[in-house]
Amino acid sequence: MASVDKIDDQMIDQDFSSQLSRAIPPDIFGNEIAHRIISGEFKIAIYGLGHVGSPMASAWLRAGATVIGVDKSPAVVEKASKGKSHIPEPGVSEAFSTGLTLDRFKIYSDQVQASRDSYFKMICVPVLLSEGGCPDLTAVKEVATNIGKGLKKGDVIALNPSVPPGTTEDLILPMIEHESGLVAENDFYMLYNPERIYEGRAILDIEERYPAIIAGAGKRSLEIGKLIYPLVFKRGVLTVSNIRAAETEKLLEGVYRDVNIALANELARYCEEIGVNFWECKEAANSQPYCHLHNPGVGVGGACIPVYPQFILYSSAQARVDCEMIKVGRSINAAMPARCVKEAIKLFDNKKKNEFVPSEATVTLLGMAFRGGVSDTRLSPTYEVIKEFQKVGIREIRIHDPLVRSDPKLNGFQNVILTSDLAKALKDTDLIMVIADHSQYSNLTPLQTDGAPIYDGRGILNRAFFDNSNYGMIGMGNNRVGAARRF
């Protein structure tokens, strides 16, 4: 059973220290580990300065540790060396800059040397999906191999990205042991610690909001982890019985959300069919503490929620378990961009009062990021929305996002313009579609949209501002253009 453990001086000084001294070398436990980390003797290497690694490095820097930031991207290394982060995560650039000033932040591109120079190595590189929907562990395997080449006796390693259950013990740990010639539990310590952050408040999540979930390759690894993590996780640690369980736990978090978003999308569609406003029903239903209806939307994006179901489906296929609900939920959410584009085009028809002519139309999409408040475009539903509009031959697609200045992935699309100028994006457009719930979009008025019909794919606009004939929203029932029946 999971348990929350908070380590304090009294516990270490009394019975806990006697137990721990029998499990691990007596000279590196308790306050000794904390002292060596804060003094800089035990350096912490963060592999991957991306959306997970950058806030993790920042949290350790803020705790007083000496951190080695490791990244293979020359652009990322150059920015970090100047005290800047390539991602606009609050507090990260400030932590980098302060760390450099205090000579506690080092930036490496050499993964092996970073392993040689550090005590605690945190693997924070992403695990993506291949073209066929399988986990792409290329980056993790590369880092594991290079850590192994520089590994020393007594070192600690933690794998942080979400992975299919069994990845750490069946793949990553054997690679490290092979490269290093060392054995986990006897010579070094291996942990799995799934990241649990929400972009836009990542440092706060690490430091204040959640306990660190950890599991070890054995008792020694786990005990070391229980001493290290409370140095930055003020909520302490929550231990689980084994690494495979910790890997599974993180996937369950994401799948829960994906399936419930799919449920919300289906219920929104049902409410539209019977002429009922889903949003009104949702608010009333969620007043009961056992109901947690999620928000429907134009699509599910990011590197987490749409990815984790695929990891479970990949693993379940190997285990010969049919996870039908997860499949259906993923299918529903993947179909939402196409469904919403069809509904948005109906608004265009209603305004023009004649046949829709795609080759003469300009469409404005509000949001390139996968959700509001972030600049992360990974698996953004906007890409699929673009494809759907281009299938019907739209002349020009404009995209506005207050946080995304450029996106190389858009180079593969024709007649697509990305701008940070909202007025320019809306000028003389024929149709507007809200995709990301950036806060500035919630205050849009018909004066700004110049009378163009607008489809709210996130349910954030003030409906009182818009004439029903020119306004559509997921789950609005018959309080919108056309009859109650839709789709």
Where are these regions (language model features)?
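Structural/interface elements that position substrates and couple domains in central-metabolism enzymes
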Residues: 2-487
